[in-house]
Amino acid sequence: MVSRDFDRDKRLLTARQFSAVFDSPIGKVPGKHVLLLARENGLDHPRLGLVIGKKNVKLAVQRNRLKRLIRESFRHNQETLAGWDIVVIARKGLGELENPELHQQFGKLWKRLLRNRPRTESPADAPGVADGTHA
């Protein structure tokens, strides 16, 4: 079982790590008040970066609450998100949502991100390999 902590290795920390996701996102999940950008990281665990600016969420209390709730949701879903670098970008109105609504919205966003993940075809899944026939 993967630990559900949120240590330094589970966070995007440097500008270079954020730029890698911004420059070439593989997964993009827009929501009404949020945008998720994701990129595969080649690691066995996911990493999270948050972009919650004063322009979109005015009060520091709201920004801190959002960060806390997003990190908590990420922590509980990190087993299914393994191998991704994810950047969450807040849009106007995100700070006005209530906590249960935020939990529900992020649960749906994580699932949508997983649905959009490009599938890597293993040799056993390739046509003709599993049944012994060749093209």
Curated annotation (Swiss-Prot):
InterPro entries: Ribosomal_Su5_D2-typ_SF, Ribsml_uS5_D2-typ_fold_subgr, RNase_P, RNase_P_CS
This protein's GO CC annotations: ribonuclease P complex
GO biological process: tRNA 5'-leader removal
GO molecular function, one term: ribonuclease P activity
Enzymatic reactions: Endonucleolytic cleavage of RNA, removing 5'-extranucleotides from tRNA precursor
Record's signal peptide: none
Keywords associated with the record: Endonuclease, Hydrolase, Nuclease, RNA-binding, tRNA processing
EC number: 3.1.26.5
Family classification: Belongs to the RnpA family.
Function, as annotated: RNaseP catalyzes the removal of the 5'-leader sequence from pre-tRNA to produce the mature 5'-terminus. It can also cleave other RNA substrates such as 4.5S RNA. The protein component plays an auxiliary but essential role in vivo by binding to the 5'-leader sequence and broadening the substrate specificity of the ribozyme.
Protein name according to UniProt: Ribonuclease P protein component
Gene label: rnpA
